[in-house]
Structures are given as C-alpha cells and as structure tokens.
Amino acid sequence: MDEASHLPNGSLKNMEFTPVGFIKSKRNTTQTQVVSPTKVPNANNGDENEGPVKKRQRRSIDDTIDSTRLFSEASQFDDSFPEIKANIPPSPRSGNVDKSRKRNLIDDLKKDVPMSQPLKEQEVREHQMKKERFDRALESKLLGKRHITYANSDISNKELYINEIKSLKHEIKELRKEKNDTLNNYDTLEEETDDLKNRLQALEKELDAKNKIVNSRKVDDHSGCIEEREQMERKLAELERKLKTVKDQVLELENNSDVQSLKLRSKEDELKNLMNELNELKSNAEEKDTQLEFKKNELRKRTIELNELKIKSDEMDLQLKQKQNESKRLKDELNELETKFSENGSQSSAKENELKMLKNKIAELEEEISTKNSQLIAKEGKLASLMAQLTQLESKLNQRDSQLGSREEELKKTNDKLQKDIRIAREETVSKDERITDLQKKVKQLENDLFVIKKTHSESKTITDNELESKDKLIKILENDLKVAQEKYSKMEKELKEREFNYKISESKLEDEKTTLNEKISNLAAENSQLKNKIEDNSTATHHMKENYEKQLESLRKDIEEYKESAKDSEDKIEELKIRIAENSAKVSEKRSKDIKQKDEQISDLTQNLKLQEDEISSLKSIIDRYKKDFNQLKSEQSNIQHDLNLQILNLENKLIESEDELKSLRDSQKIEIENWKRKYNNLSLENDRLLTEKESASDKEREISILNRKLDEMDKEKWNLQESKEKYKRELQKVITANDRLRREKEELNENSNNIRIMEDKMTRIKKNYLSEITSLQEENRRLEERLILNERRKDNDSTMQLNDIISYYKLKYHSEVRHNNDLKVINDYLNKVLALGTRRLRLDTRKGEHSLNISLPDDDELDRDYYNSHVYTRYHDYEYPLRFNLNRRGPYFERRLSFKTVALLVLACVRMKRIAFYRRSDDNRLRILRDRIESSSGRISW
C-alpha cells in the first residue's frame, strides 16, 4: 500500500499533486483550503430522487485513483540536492510562488563554512556526495532489477491469461451474431489496432535511431538530450493513451471470451448429460432384451404345458371310452340279469341285490363321467384363458415390432444426420474431434444393440409365430375332441335315459310278478289246507322225511344267514363307497349333486322295497313253519300224496342247490367286482388328487400370467417414456450441432484475433524493455555527470567562484530535473504494472460473475472476490442485472450521472496543481537557459 494514503491531514501542505500521484515538496507551502479527500460524499449532492445512501468507511487520501493504489513512497520524490540560486532576482508574482524558491543556498553555505578550512569541508562534502551517489546507484540498480522481474512475471501471467483466452476464443462468435453493434465496434477497434501497430513500429524505429544517436553522441551534448526527452515524454503520453484504449478493447474481448467460455462449459455439461442418458438407454435396452428372453422362456413353458394338457385330454378320452365300454358291459349284464329275473321269479331277492349293485355301479359311473366332464370344462376354460393370453402377447409383440421399426427409422435418420454433422465438425474443428468420435462410437454401439435387438426380436417373433401356429392346431384338435366327447356324452345321456325308462318298465313288471306270486301263494295255501288232511294221514310215513327235511332247512337257514351277512358286508362296503363318492361329488357342481341326490333317493326306495321283500320272505318262512306244523299234523293224510311231495321236495332241493350255486357264483363275482371297484376308486382318488394339483398349478399360472401382463403394461409405459426421451435427445443433439457450428466459426475468428493480440503484447513487452533500458542508461549518465562535476569542481580555481557557482547551480538544476523525470518514469511504470494487475484481477472477477450467473462451478484455488460489475458497454449488450453496492454508484461517467462535489473538487485541485507544476517547470527551464547563457558568455565556449 502507498504511504501517501496514510499521511495525516497536516502533511498535505507539503504534498504536490501530479498526474500520477502525490509528491512531497518544499515548494508547496500555500495555505489553500482543500476539501478533505477522505470525506464521504453527501447523498444530497447527487440526485434528490435517489434513495438513502449506504454507509461506508472513510477512504484514503488518494481518492482520485483509489482502486489502483499506484503510489510508492513519497521519499523517492525528495530532492537529492538542495536548490541553488545565484544572483536570481525575485519574481514579481510572489503570491503564486513558494517562499522556498527564493532561497539561495550559496549564501547559507558561505555563512556556515569557516574560511580557514575550505578544502577539508569540500573533501567532506565530496565524500558524503560520493556515498549518497553510490547508495542511489545501488538503489537504482535494485529498482531496475525489480522492475525487470516484475515485468517478466507480468508477462508470464499475461501469457497464462492469453492461453486461457485461446481456449475460450472459439465461443465469441455467438455474441457477434447476436449483437451486430459489437461487430462494428470490433472492426473499428481492429482498424485502430492496425494503426497503433504501424505507429508503434514507427516509434520503435525512431527509438532505435535515437538510441543510436544518443549512444554515438558525446557526453557534453545535453541540450539535445533534453529536447529529445521532452519529445519522448510527449510520445509516451500518447502511447499511454493508446495503451489504455487497447487495454479497454482487450478487456472487452476477454469479457466476451469469458462469457463464451461459460457457455461452452454449459454445453459440455449438456453433452455429458446426453452421454449419460445414452448410457441409460443402453442399459434399458439390455434390460428389455432380458425381459424378452424371459417372456420367450415363459412362452416355451406355456407351449410345453399345452402339450401336456393335450396328452392329458387324450388320456381322459381313453378313460371315457373305457368307462363307456364298462357301462355297456354293465348294461348287458343288467339285461342278462333282467332276463334271468324274468325266468327265475323265486330268486327275486338275489337278483334285486344284483340290480342294486348294478345301479350303484351305474351311479358311480355317472358320477365319474360328471367329474370328467367338469374337468374337461375346467381345462376348456384354461385353454380359453391361454388363448386369450396368447392373443394379447401377439398383439403386444406386434406393437413392439411397429414401435421398434419406427425407432429404427428414427435412429437411422438421426444417425445419418449425426454422421454428416460429425464429418463437418472433423474438418472444421480439431478440439472437438475426440468428443465427436466418442459420440460416433456410442451411436454405433446403439445401432449394433438395435440390430441385435431386431435379430432377437425377429427370431422370437418367428418362434412365437411357430409356437402359436402349433398351439392353434392343438387347440383345434382339442376342440374337435371336445365336440366328439360332448356327442358321446349326449349319447350316453340318451342311453341312460332309455335304461331308466326300461328300469321303470322292469319295476312295473316285477310288481305284476309279485301279484302273481301272491296269488300263487294263496293257491298254495289252499292246496296246503287240502293237503293237511292228507298229511295227517301220512305223518307216520313221513316222520323220517321230516327229520331229513328239517336238517336240510337248517342248512338252508345257515346258508341264508351267511348270505345275509355277506349282503350286509356288501351293503356296508357300498355305503362306504357312497360316502367316498359323496365326498368326491362334493367337489362336483351343484347340478351333479342334485342328480346324485335323486339317484340316492331312488336307491333308498329300492332298499325299502328290498326290505319289504325281505319281510315278505320272513312272513313266507313263518308260513312255511306253520306249514311244517300242519305237515306234522297231516302226516297221516299225506300218505297218499307222499310220492307227489317227494317229487316236489326233490324239485325244491334241486332249486336250492341251483340257488346255492348261483349264490356262490354271485359272491365270487361280487368279490371280484368289489376288488375292481376298489381299484377304480383308488385310481379315481389319484386322478382327483392330480386334478387338484393341476388346478392349483393352473391358478398359480394364472397369477403368473396376470403378473406378466402387468409387466408388459409397465414395459409399454417405459417404451413410451423412452420414445419421449429419445425425441428430447434428438432436439438436444440438433442444438448441440448448431452450437458446434457456431463455436467452430468463432474459433476461426478468435484465432485471427489471438494472433493480433499476441503481436500487440510482444510489442508492449519490447517497449517496456526499451523504457527500462533507457532508465538504466539515464541513471548511468547521471552518475557520469556527477563524477564529471566533482572532477570539474576540483580542477577549477578559487578565483572563478561565480562561474563555478553558475555551473554548479546549472548542473544541480539539471540533475534535479532528471531525477524528477526518472521518478516520474518510475511512478508511471508502477502505475502501468498495477493497472495491468488490476486488469487481470478484473478479468478474473468478471469470469467469476459470469460463471455465477450461468451456475458454473469454479475451481477451488480461485479465491478472488468481486463486489459488482460496472462496465457500461457490457451491461448495455447483456441483460445481466448485478446488484450495485451503493445508490451513488448507479450513476457516473459510465452511467450518465451528475458529478458529485468531491470529484469536481478533486479535479479542480488537480488542475491547480498541474498549473503550478507547469509554472515550476517553465521557471526551471528559464533558469537553466539563463545559467547556460551566462556560462557561455563568461567562458566563450560550451563547457558541458
């Protein structure tokens, strides 16, 4: 920081304002009342319509160029020698001139120096002057080295910024297209830069020529040097102005390049997002491939299940045929039994039992047929559901095919467009070749993936079509089989109805036969009553016959009891079978249960009839017992009819033997039939269990089918979402392609501009180096002049004191002017360096502001800060609304605001100081000219 900015208010009396800062001076002793430069301006001085002003701290003294902090220590502006005036009359304008200028230091020296030791004092002064000159020479060398290092570091920093600008130049073209005014301004600036280049080249040539002249001239030619320096100062001022204009132009270009760099970064982020979305599309496509394979496997499983169902339906048809054959066989047996029953009326009880058994078998067969029919109906429902699912899958596959075809066409079009755009970008841009190649690779991968998906889809489509055709054939075959089975079932129902009708007819016939048997029994009773008398007569003869007959009756009773027991066992087994059938029939539909109930009622009626017949048989047995008693009584009467009775008994015995044989055969056949029915029951139970498992598996499969349908719906939704995202990606790709074209064009233009900027920067560095070399050469020249002064002072005699005083004062004045000039050059150099540093800092802050407005993340090492942006040109062409710090700053030289009192006062003070400095400069020049004339007139020749 500058010491001038921290001086107390009282020290302002000794300060001199120059175009580049404050300088301590003994001349500036006027007691002018100055407005405090650190005072905060009042808000009322500005526009009255503005709002309240924000508070801020008291600023430093140097408020004119406070942002730059340009000024070095004030000690460097101190006079290295006191000013010497010899025989100079006082100026008539004493009010405008400092009192310090009236001092003549020669008189003071004469007063202070004792006359006895002039040589010693002179040696002491010379020694002190040598020390001071040596120290000053060292300081000047160090300052020169520091300036050179600072310039080199500044050049390196500029090169870094130039490299950054190069990387961002290809994005400036968008601003030029959007804002034609900036293009026109830029053209004018380019013309001005060309003019400046030409001028700089001419100035460089002039400087080289003048350097050669200065080096070739002798040391004594100081008047020419002074004139040349004045010309150089003027040219430097002009060059500084031109440099400022060029720097402003460079700042504008850098700001534009920063904005374009931010846009480029945003577009790069968009490209990255696009790449990520393409990767997501790839992953989604892979997932869909896996889902398609999974669905193919499910279709294969369904085809296998359909084949199994077909095989099972064939087995069921075979079982139905077998049962139909069994029903036919049982019908034939019924017919045979009916014929036998008609032939053997006395054996009605056994035949009725056989009829019951056959009826039970028929009922069981009907129940089995009903269960098989229900199973067939369930399987038909399953087949219908499977067909519906297959049709749905076919429709979805067709939709997928159409969607994939549209996707393929769209992707082909987009791929063709992308390839054309990528070829153009390869020819025009080198920086984006890698990105474009990556995009091409990804597009090719997507094409390959789509081609693979197409192949797999076509294969799956062919497989599914073949499977569907085969399943359609199977379904048609099954439908035909079902029709045949239904026809057979209708025929069976008709036959059963006919048999029921025949059974009713046979029942009526049996009732008629019962009536005839009762009549016969009554006739036999009458005959027995007639025979009683005969039997009483023949009782003695038939007593032995009676005993034999009783034995035979007891054996018959035993056989009947055994038959009853076997009948009870068979009835128990039949009841168990009925219970099992009822349990199985509970699973059958309600219609079949009603039919079974009706048939159970019929069976119960038949059992009641059988019981009645058994009661009748028991009554007949009681009658037979009575007949036996009567027979004992009528033995005497039956002597005559014994032969007839014996014949009857023989007939009865033969009938009993036949009935016993028939009973045995019936028992055997019943056992065989019971075993067969047990086997059939076991088989039916196994089939029932298998059907239940199939039913459960079918329900599970229906659930799986519903889940698959849901998945297919989800896949359709995902497909629509993917299509929408694909359209978005196409739009974004078109935007990126247009942006790429813009950036390519801007890159070409910026490459041209960057070359011009490089040339300008190289020239600036050369000029700086020339200035530094001139400063060092001037310092060496001053040192030589001082040495010559010392030598000339030693050579001069004591008599020529006036001439010596004139020469000393002349060289002192010249030395002071040169020192001031060197100090001014140093201050200018520091000012330029600091302006460059602030310019770079401002560029960084502008980039930060642009990145913040575009939401771009900054690097971690950038710790700069920017309060607000105050470029009128930038805000005019950009609608960025940066918040300003104060209301007063909303107006100004760049914002068309009325000047505040402080700025006006400081400008007036600067003008006054400039006037004073010009006056002092003219007075010094007059003094130098007068001294030179006096020396020339006294010596008659030029002595320097």
UniProtKB/Swiss-Prot annotation:
UniProt key word Protein transport: no
Residue ranges, annotated region (Disordered): 23-110
InterPro entries membership: Spc110_C
Coiled-coil positions: 119-799
Name of the protein: Spindle pole body component 110
Nuclear localization signal (motif): residue ranges: 54-59, 726-731, 742-747
SUPFAM superfamilies: Tropomyosin
Record family assignment: Belongs to the SPC110 family.
Ranges of biased composition (kind: Basic and acidic residues): 96-110
Alphabetical keyword list: Coiled coil, Cytoplasm, Cytoskeleton, Nucleus, Phosphoprotein
PTM annotation (Phosphothreonine): residues: T18, T64, T68
